[in-house]
Every structure is written in structure tokens, then in C-alpha cells.
């Protein structure tokens, strides 16, 4: 009977430690992101589009945030296919990431009122993106470092 009692106490102890350790597990929900956050756009080049046109849109996109005093980075990438250790020479897709310093800054930006000039400037770079690319993927991202 004493052995059964000790086994029961041991089982309760291990269960308690297991429950408490799970309680302190870090959350990886987007709303708990502690690093920089971003909007990721993956695009395909239109037949009539050019990398030069895409780069022009990226430049205006960056200027849009800078002109409004925001510390936001617009990063653009050209993706290339890989075949084993070799990289193909032709662009595969284009990627744009709009990086905000924090979730709080992104939220403040998203909840602000757009002026007529804001909308005009926004439409200007979006039109250039749309003339050169088609967005196929939209994601929100959290940088862990």
C-alpha cells in the first residue's frame, strides 16, 4: 500500500511539472511577435512587365513611407529557380517585403487616416507594380531576430 502511495505521489509530481512547463511555452502567434513585422508580396512578372518597372515601383513605395516620416523598409528580391547546385539565369518570381520596426508601429500605420495625397501617392506605385507584376501570395511575417 505504501508503494502505491509513493507511485501516486510521483505521478502527481511529474504531471504537475509537465503542466507548469507547458504553461510557460512561448507563443508564436502573430499578435505576440516581438521583432520586426512585415507584409510579404510574392509576384509573377507579367509578359509585358520588366524588372526595371518593378524596381521603379519599389523606389516609389519606399519614398511613400519616407515622405511620411516612417522608419519602414521596402525590400525587393528577384527569385531564381535552383536545379541541384545550379541557379537558373532567368528570374522566376519577384518578392517585396514591407518591414515595420514592430507590430505596434504597423498597427498605428494601418489605423491612420489616409489623406487625398496619401491615396494619390499610394495609387501611383501600385499602378506601376500592377503594370509589371501580378501578386500571387500575400502574407504577414514576423522576424525572429
Please annotate each region the language model reported:
Residues 23-29, 64-75, 86-93, 97-142:
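An amphipathic, aromatic/His-enriched active-site/gating alpha helix that lines ligand/cofactor pockets
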Residues 46-55:
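Short, surface-exposed ligand-recognition loops at beta-strand->loop->(often short) alpha-helix junctions
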Residues 17-21:
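Sec/Tat signal peptide C-region and signal peptidase I cleavage site
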Residues 4-15:
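Sec-dependent N-terminal signal peptides
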Residues 8, 29-30:
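N-terminal prepro-regions of secreted/extracellular proteins
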